[in-house]
């Protein structure tokens, strides 16, 4: 079985240790399963049997955007698909998105909690319009956050509003549509033509609910993801293998959906 992990994080070697320590110190229960570096991710992938990983950076300050996006070119490989970043409260985002599109980046990650913005506010619609026009993928951190945040910046009904206004925008709502808000997800967005990834759900969602949700939403819109380094990639792979899901559907979730969405060879 080929496997694409659609939701991973790394940091430059010189700051990875510091970044890991900062997050573990501010997030209850957080534990890293790699050292947060590119090599650490690759080692974890090897142990888990993962062929390819999507890296999702987050600019928590406007000054970080250019450095992160410039690193994308060096990260691109058969095994690594780096996404870019923007800082939504600046007016620089059209230039940043244009740059990412020109160098072949597949999409961007937005973290409404870390970046402190409400995704449904109309002042952010120009971002979605450009991404839709450029045919780039938008990954939202969706739902609550285990860190010191309110967790109301990307609720299921807000994701629905973004989709309704930009129906051709390729949206990935991380954490099965909304971390710890799966009742709302099932009510608001379960059957919309957007993708969910499975990251950071194994410990909390429950097998019965997970199986019900992927059946209702459609396995063709589910992407395997782990949120590495914060979750053990090998255990997440093993978990999905054990579920009572057909081999055909496991292939879709593990790699076929992501391969088609990313338009890559594997």
Give residue ranges: language-model regions.
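Mid-to-C-terminal alpha-helical segments outside catalytic/metal-binding sites
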Residues: 1-10, 15-52, 216-221, 234-266
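Short, well-structured secondary-structure segments
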Residues: 49-64, 77-86, 109
